[in-house]
Amino acid sequence: MAPVGGGGRPVGGPARGRLLLAAPVLLVLLWALGARGQGSPQQGTIVGMRLASCNKSCGTNPDGIIFVSEGSTVNLRLYGYSLGNISSNLISFTEVDDAETLHKSTSCLELTKDLVVQQLVNVSRGNTSGVLVVLTKFLRRSESMKLYALCTRAQPDGPWLKWTDKDSLLFMVEEPGRFLPLWLHILLITVLLVLSGIFSGLNLGLMALDPMELRIVQNCGTEKERRYARKIEPIRRKGNYLLCSLLLGNVLVNTSLTILLDNLIGSGLMAVASSTIGIVIFGEILPQALCSRHGLAVGANTILLTKFFMLLTFPLSFPISKLLDFFLGQEIRTVYNREKLMEMLKVTEPYNDLVKEELNMIQGALELRTKTVEDIMTQLQDCFMIRSDAILDFNTMSEIMESGYTRIPVFEDEQSNIVDILYVKDLAFVDPDDCTPLKTITRFYNHPVHFVFHDTKLDAMLEEFKKGKSHLAIVQKVNNEGEGDPFYEVLGLVTLEDVIEEIIKSEILDESDMYTDNRSRKRVSEKNKRDFSAFKDADNELKVKISPQLLLAAHRFLATEVSQFSPSLISEKILLRLLKYPDVIQELKFDEHNKYYARHYLYTRNKPADYFILILQGKVEVEAGKENMKFETGAFSYYGTMALTSVPSDRSPAHPTPLSRSASLSYPDRTDVSTAATLAGSSNQFGSSVLGQYISDFSVRALVDLQYIKITRQQYQNGLLASRMENSPQFPIDGCTTHMENLAEKSELPVVDETTTLLNERNSLLHKASHENAI
């Protein structure tokens, strides 16, 4: 180690040498910065400048020189030190010839007035950057551009120094002029915007109109719609050509609109935003919303404009359309199959004018080819059928009539073996009393039996029925299950009515139907059903032999022709039981040797009678009037209606009431207990007092054997009361209830029920004996 203070280089020699070399360089740099900024950092120094923004066209050219438009406001970003100490009067610009002569001089001999420095704003916290606002004036007409350089000074009264680098240069160029007057510019933009909307709307409206739909409108639309469709349909057939023309026109108009807006506004961003908003709102949304709802009317009224643009774009759009036709084929038109058509009708039901029944019929007709007879047939076990060995007596014919069917299958041995068809009209000349065998009728008419297979479609079945062979068919299928040979198995019946019901989707009911639906077996209301079995004489109630047909005729005649027996007074059920009561239907054998025998007289003049008579068979002589006029009558003539409702002259004071018996029965709605008491009391009087009986003023004498109906007043009144009991089983009086037992206690009339009240044998025999004694 060397001694201290010995010879050699001083400690740190190399480092100290480098520091001594760097010191002069640092001084030179600081001097240069001071000379460029014309002041110390405390006075403010500008290091650089670049373009921040402007309100017109501006930017930087490829050489890095800033260019701005005349008559604009330019914001320049300045960088340096202590920029907050720099005021606007320390910054200016001078005009230079070109960038090459910029270095020849550093002094600003003449400041320009074309650039006006406003102020320095937005200075940063460190005073290292700020924005200089500069206003550019308009160039002279002979000038298209000028070049300016930045000039600065350190003091307000100091000399101006010019910057000599390209960063300090500023080009001011002439503002691009409009190639059209302002009013024409705006008018052209408006026209293009309207055309853009028309093309966009027609593109949606016309292309949405299907050629098939246009043909439909031509045939079934309104007069105006037909006229519109006739105008549009020829050009709509050329779908691709029309599409290309509309799209080319739309693109051309939108492009031109954007260029005009850019020229009018002068800013690229604003032009793009304005054209986008205008095209979207006025060129797309509004016209498409309008044409989607009124495409037919808009397309017809703009047909000339459409044809014009088709002609204008023909050189380009027509070849393109042919290429589309070649590669894509012809336009696919809307065609609805059965399922789509049915679904369309269902979906549009709230908007069309079809009622539900019409919609059901259309749906049923469309489903005709998809359903089979097995879907609508009546199962064999639910069919009404008749044996081939049946006898057509009253019971059998009543059963046939009660079934309500007009075509009845005839089977032999078992129901699946159907051999004939019986039509109800075949029985028109058949007398039930003859007990004709059914085979006699079926062999005489020999109606063909029509068989169909279970998978037969309903449209084919309808065609078979239309041929008139039969309106009823037997449904069968080939049963090849199990061992043995296949055989035909009968499944059920199908009729023309079943097919029609399936078409109209509703049940057809007439007065003879028993079921609303053969498949659901829902029965029809039986309020109109006639029970022919009630006229059978199997119970031997009638002592006089009378045919069920004559009994039925007498019942209907009394109920409809004789007001005293109308259903409003006596129910049909009570009337029928009254007719079947013993001694109501009587016979009289005529004695040829004693024509004026007393028993031949049904009525004798001036003698009391309390009965009504209806002639069923035979002939009588009637003598009436002071002149003793005589005339003959026959079947279904009747006498003594007044005897049924006459009022007794000696009413018992024990039953004071203002309402007589006959009057109360004339108004069945009134149910006063006093009336009931009057009925009971009057009944006893009629049975015992001759003075209360009807006195006939005519005579009726039999001329031949007679069969007639004889109804006494007692029976008639009991029938009235029974009918009232049937509708109202209790008589209310002053909020209380009088039962039938109490009514029986007040009179000799037995307890009123459906049997004893209507037909009291003891009273009937009493009246009969009284009548014979009176005669």
UniProtKB/Swiss-Prot annotation:
Residues 178-358 form the CNNM transmembrane domain. Residues 377-438, 445-511 form the CBS domain. Disulfide bonds: none annotated. Residues 1-178, 286-293 are extracellular. InterPro entries: ACDP, CBS_dom, CBS_dom_sf, cNMP-bd_dom, cNMP-bd_dom_sf, CNNM, Ion_transp-like_CBS, RmlC-like_jellyroll. Widely expressed. Highly expressed in heart. Residues 241-261 dip into the membrane without crossing it. Keywords: Amelogenesis imperfecta, Biomineralization, CBS domain, Cell membrane, Cone-rod dystrophy, Disease variant, Glycoprotein, Ion transport, Membrane, Phosphoprotein, Repeat, Sensory transduction, Transmembrane, Transmembrane helix, Transport, Vision. It comes from the Eukaryota. It is found in: Cell membrane. GO terms for cellular component: basolateral plasma membrane; plasma membrane; protein-containing complex. GO terms for molecular function: magnesium ion transmembrane transporter activity; sodium ion transmembrane transporter activity. Residues 200-240, 262-264, 317-775 are cytoplasmic. It is linked to Jalili syndrome: A syndrome characterized by the association of cone-rod dystrophy and amelogenesis imperfecta. Belongs to the ACDP family. This is Metal transporter CNNM4.
